[in-house]
Structure formats: C-alpha cells, structure tokens
Amino acid sequence: GNVSAGTSDFAMVVVDHKLNVHEEIDMVTTPAGKPVAMVHCNNCTSDLNAWVNLFKEYQELLGIPVNMDEIYSKLYNIALTGDTDCGGLLSYNYISGEPVTGFADGRPLFVRSANDKFNLANFMRTHLYASVGVLKIGNDILFNEEKIKVDRITGHGGLFRTKGVGQRILAAAINSPISVMETAGEGGAWGIALLGSYLVNNKKGQSLADFLDESVF
C-alpha cells in the first residue's frame, strides 16, 4: 500500500478479498486493475503549516534569515523528543470538513488544560499526530475490522520531506512499517513520471507491476 500525506492525505491498500461497505472507505483500482481500498482525508498538514508560518513570522520579526526547510526540520525533529502522550495537548486540525468523521465544515482547534505539559516538543508532536489522526480512523477499519494485512506501506508527500519524522509518526499511528524513498517529497508528479517511463521502457508484454518490481523498486 501507499500513503500520500501533505495538505490532505490518503491511504491506498491493494486488497485480495471483497470488503464490507464502509462510508469511510472508497474502492478504486490500480492502473493494472487491482482492487484498492482508499481512505481519503481532507485535512492533513494545513493546520500544522499555519502554525509553522507563525514561527516563520516570529523569526522574521527578530531579523533572522528565514529558510523554510530548516524551520520545518527543526520543528519536526523537536517533536520526536516530546512525551508519548504529547503532554496531554490536543489538536483538531479540521481546516475543512471531514467526511470520514462526519464533519461538514472545518474549525481548527488547539486545546490544553492548565496542568498539561505545554512546551514546543509536545506542541509539534501533537500537531504531527493530528495530521494523520483521521487517516488512522480509516486504516483501523481496514486493519482491525476487515483484517487486511499489508506487506509494506510506502510514504510520499510533504509530510515526509524531513527525514525520519513523518515516517515514525505515521508508523506509530497506523501500527505498520513505513518505507520512504529519496523521492518521497515529490508526490504525485513522480508517480506520473513512472507511468510515462513504463510506456517508453517496458519490455514487450511486461506488466506494470513487473516493471515496477524489476526496474524501479
């Protein structure tokens, strides 16, 4: 399977048996025609990105040169040092409505009690987990109710641009091993390029699946 995670996110898992009907799950196919269960979520990193931009404005206010890749790297990595329970902090990252959880409109919300452990590491960890929270709900249906087994899940998209962080957050959220390639941050454009390469470079009669296994992965 694979997970694309950026401003929105989705998981696509190739399945080998017929599933029950779930409002949270869409059935699609691979380019080769294999059945795929898809969990699509409207909200992923948009709310987190808004907070990162706030930190960028503060850095600009101090007169410090801004490098967005460095800001993301520092903030994402500090999240790994946070408490496992995020210090009790909660984030609801719904910039827009979320059909998976039945919300028609978005109202992003950050919540803490007076005694929660409110620091930067826990703050960032909270928002990273919130980014994949709805995705976890859909994947729990696939893994726990439908008993889907996955060989591997490949992550791609902006969440994985900072090496190791998004990968670990997602692995913990959906309790599955996540592999990430060097091209993870390229997103859909890289997949389109692969399809183009297949059309040009496949051996006579070679299926797309065989081409990907033998020449790409």
Give each language-model segment a name.
Residues 1-154, 159-217:
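Active-site core segments that coordinate phosphate-bearing ligands/cofactors
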